[in-house]
Amino acid sequence: MAVCISFINFKGGVGKTASTVNIAACLAAYEHKRVLVVDLDPQCNSSLWLMQPQAWREHVGKGRRSVYQLFRDHINGTHVFDFDEAVVRGVPRREFPLIASLDLLPASVELLKIEDQIYQNKYGQFFSYLYKSLKPHLSEYDYVFFDCPPNLYAVTKNALFASEYCVVPYVPDFLSLSGFQVLAEQVDAFAKRISGYVTGRKPVSIGALLVSHYRAVGNVFAQAINEMEMQLNKFKAGELVAAEAEILQPYIRYCVAVAESTDEHLPVVLHKVNSIGAQDYFQLAKAFDKHFQSLT
């Protein structure tokens, strides 16, 4: 059964999508894991990182073969969404799959319309739509990664309900430190709220943090990471995060090749395998797998 993990942060520009895509690619390509990336952000960044724009537009159409249709079915009581039709197998693709065991359930811009529609049903279990639709397919994968939008609205709550853990990518600075406390409190409050609806598994908790855009210049970044470690230990003692939560290493160093790889619609390990970004994500994926396998 898949380990389901939400990549989440209220802040943008912290490497959330980069971490989702590149860790997924490394796990699938080098650790022989079966990985599904579920793009839940209406910006569709994971989808467009792993698919050519024209291929993505043709695939999702008006959202029918995307996660948008999954939510619409639950809202309207229809049965249009078909997992096997919606999922793109073996992404990225050229004439053939480049990573055979990496799949994508793409987003579409129509997701912008869905929040208000979901909240019309907020007195029901609106947070369970995603899990109910994916549950029959979880045995096909070792990992399911949810690339969440930078908020804690209905779609993100669906991801949290479907997840055992969430991972918080962040840039080590003061704003990330202050924002992490709010995020940890909100995730913990939601986990307590849904605990009565989760059967046979634990409610979601923060299981790890990832450092991105790291620069070993001076001691500013090192000091910020040290402060985050102290806050993380405080939250573990207060049971706001998982007792085993840690800041995974290596830290992802700032690397132009990671940004360039988005233009090529490739994970950095396929774009420039010898870059420091590819090396960091390769090692981080190993640490990531070891960490989460020890928790399950």
Q: What are these model-predicted stretches?
A:
Residues 1-296:
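P-loop NTP-binding core
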